A protein has these predicted regions:
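Structural motif
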Residues: 112-115, 140-144, 197-199
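Amide-forming acyltransferase catalytic core, primarily the GNAT-like/NAT-type
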Residues: 15-111, 118-122, 126-127, 131, ...
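Active-site loop ensemble at the mouth of alpha/beta enzyme cores that anchors a bound cofactor
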Residues: 144-182
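Conserved active-site alpha-helix within GNAT-family acetyltransferase domains
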Residues: 1-19, 145-160
Length: 254
C-alpha cells in the first residue's frame, strides 16, 4: 500500500492499481448530485449484504479491489464504525451506493465509495453536498477508468473539483513464467515478444523470457534468445493483475 511503499518498492514491487482522488466544497457537489429515494447510516455489520451487493457490481471488471466474504465484510464494517460512519443510498430496486467516511476539522473524508450505477453515484454526491455548513471540503475516491468529469458543468475538472491520481495497490511477480503463462488474450493477437528481465532482489528470475500469443492464450517460457525489450521486475509487477478487462463507466447522462 502507498503508506508502506518505501519498504516494498526496493524489493521489486510495483503499483498496479490507481484511482482518482477528488476534493470539492460540498456546495459544488450539489450541482452534480441527485437525491436518492432513501438514505440511512449503518450502526452495525448486520446489513453487510447491502454493501456486498453494491461492491460486487462496482468492482466487477475492475482491477485492484479485494475479494470480501461475510467475515471480511463484518470486520471491515466494524473497524469503520469505530472511527467513522457508513452511509447507504437506495433506489427503487434496492441498495445503490455506499460511503465510508469520517468528519474531522470541517473536512469530510470518504475513504471508500462504491455505487451500482450513475444514479447511485449522484446519490452519494448529494449526500456529501448535504453537509454544507458542517464541513468545508469533501474528499473522495473513484476508479481511474471513470470519465464522468468530462460531463461536469462549467469545466469543473481541476477548477472547483480537484482531481488527481492516487495509487492504492502494490503487487510483486515472484515467478514470471507462472505469472504470465496461460493468461487469456484476444484470439486476434498473434506473435511473440522476447525481453530481458532484471531482478536484483530475486536474481534467479533474471534472464530472457518469451511471451507468445496463440489461440487466445499467452504462453511464457524462459530461454536464451535475442530479446526485443529490457525491463526490471517492478516494471512487470506494475502491470494489471487480476481482472484486466477495461470497464466502460455508465454514461453520466443515464
Amino acid at each position: 500500500m502507498p503508506s508502506a511503499a518505501s519498504f516494498y518498492l526496493p524489493m521489486g514491487f510495483g503499483f498496479y492499481a490507481h484511482q482518482w482522488e477528488r476534493s470539492a466544497a460540498p456546495e459544488r457537489l450539489a450541482a452534480l448530485g441527485r437525491r436518492a429515494e432513501s438514505c440511512r447510516t449503518l450502526t452495525s455489520s448486520n446489513d453487510w449484504k447491502d454493501l456486498a451487493s453494491i461492491y460486487r457490481e462496482y468492482t466487477k471488471k475492475r482491477n485492484g479491489w479485494a475479494y470480501r466474504d461475510e467475515k471480511s465484510w463484518e470486520k471491515h464494517i466494524d473497524a469503520q464504525l469505530l472511527e467513522g460512519y457508513i452511509a447507504v443510498t437506495y433506489d427503487r430496486k434496492g441498495p445503490s451506493g455506499y460511503l465510508f467516511y469520517t468528519l474531522d476539522d470541517r473536512k469530510m473524508i470518504a475513504s471508500e465509495m462504491a455505487f451500482k450505477n450513475e444514479a447511485g453515484r449522484k446519490a452519494l454526491y448529494a449526500f456529501m453536498a448535504g453537509h454544507q455548513g458542517s464541513v468545508d471540503t469533501c474528499v473522495w475516491y473513484e476508479p481511474l477508468d471513470d470519465h464522468s468529469f468530462r460531463y461536469w458543468q462549467d469545466g469543473a475538472e481541476h477548477t472547483y473539483i480537484k482531481n488527481r491520481t492516487f495509487p492504492f495497490m502494490l503487487g510483486r511477480v515472484i515467478d514470471p513464467v507462472i505469472a504470465f503463462d496461460g493468461l487469456p488474450c484476444s484470439k486476434e493477437i498473434k506473435g511473440e515478444i522476447a525481453f530481458q528481465l532484471i531482478d536484483s532482489f530475486l536474481p534467479e528470475n533474471s534472464g530472457i523470457y518469451v511471451l507468445r500469443a496463440e489461440d487466445g492464450r499467452i504462453h511464457a517460457l524462459k530461454e536464451d534468445v535475442f530479446y526485443d525489450l529490457k525491463c526490471h521486475i517492478e516494471d512487470i509487477s506494475g502491470l494489471r493483475l487480476g481482472s484486466c478487462l477495461l470497464y466502460t463507466s455508465p454514461s453520466p447522462r443515464d
